[in-house]
Amino acid sequence: MVRRKRQEEDEKIEIERVKEESLKLAKQAEEKRRLEESKEQGKRIQVDDDQLAKTTSKDKGQINHSKDVVEEDVNPPPSIDGKSEIGDGTSVNPRCLCCFHCHRPFVMHEILKKGKFHIDCYKEYYRNRNCYVCQQKIPVNAEGIRKFSEHPFWKEKYCPIHDEDGTAKCCSCERLEPRGTNYVMLGDFRWLCIECMGSAVMDTNEVQPLHFEIREFFEGLFLKVDKEFALLLVEKQALNKAEEEEKIDYHRAAVTRGLCMSEEQIVPSIIKGPRMGPDNQLITDIVTESQRVSGFEVTGILIIYGLPRLLTGYILAHEMMHAWLRLNGYKNLKLELEEGLCQALGLRWLESQTFASTDAAAAAAVASSSSFSSSTAPPAAITSKKSDDWSIFEKKLVEFCMNQIKEDDSPVYGLGFKQVYEMMVSNNYNIKDTLKDIVSASNATPDSTV
């Protein structure tokens, strides 16, 4: 008890000493600032006097001899970039008087734990030492180093073992399941977090309003898709089978979530998807119906079911761009450039969602200032849900989806998007002009003039 009391007293003394030295450094910095202001003011006065003397001499027809102004620092302030001595003669770098977490000085904040942290920063710092999944302290290894994994977007730190111990991961937002929460397993063994489940599109009927919205969005960019074709939500197995029959193999490096088909196929479409029951239990009674999709350049679009509306819409916009290219005779484009353009359209739709509004004037203003345009394109379709009505998670989810596109470094989708984006920048974000560059770079010629 006595030892603990003595330790607390020592900490208080240390805190007071750090505060005193921090205030001293702040005072020195303020004196330096004032001295520099005084010097600048002196320069301005000297310049004004010289100009006045020149003007007077000129008026009198005399030759004015300028004088060199020699300035010297009187008692120059000590530098706060190097080390300073504190009361007991110890040499301390001012950076040591900053918070270990936010790196701001302690002058305007309370401090804790021997001057290392602001109180709020201390809580944040030590909160991040706990695993996001198991809520336990992230362990140190044999070398005494605390190693952790962290999602690049969500910034949630967790024990590396959870990547391998069967912890559920949401197939939409990629977050691991924290202990004490219940992720939902879909019929094709994918996991979905409760937040993503809240706006998930579960069957073919549910996706049709989004289908019409995406078509209006393309028409607003002068990329109207005239042909009618099927849009079906399917399970993962049906999507993989259709991909094989389309003889597409470049998706294998990534998870396939959508497909624009050109071959006649019989596809099991989900006409009644799963529903949430009592106590957040998923009722997985899925009803499917075999549908024949046939036609010419485009026979239909398949999208995996159970993803949130924002992610489903982005995938649909991507596949709709594939459909537009095929229907308008753009063949034999370089794979990475075609996929990059489709990613760009998916990004454009996501961006339009962040500005969704029921105010037509506001929507028009957004469209006119948008980074993607098609000469004098009218405003894109106005969505049924204003972004102001979104939950905090939905606002983060749309940022996550856009970040996934921009930060992707895969050879086809990621690098393709970056190449196309550079073309768009050089064409002032005009899609049609960018498409001409893509055709030229692919040594391809469209079958029709668009």
From Swiss-Prot:
Residues 1-46 form a coiled coil. Keywords: Coiled coil. Residues 27-47, 56-69 have a biased composition (Basic and acidic residues). It comes from Arabidopsis thaliana (Mouse-ear cress). PROSITE patterns: ZINC_PROTEASE (PS00142). This is Protein DA1-related 3. Transmembrane segments: none annotated. The keyword Transferase does not apply. InterPro entries: DA1-like (IPR045218), DA1-like_dom (IPR022087). Residues 27-87 are annotated as: Disordered. The gene is DAR3.
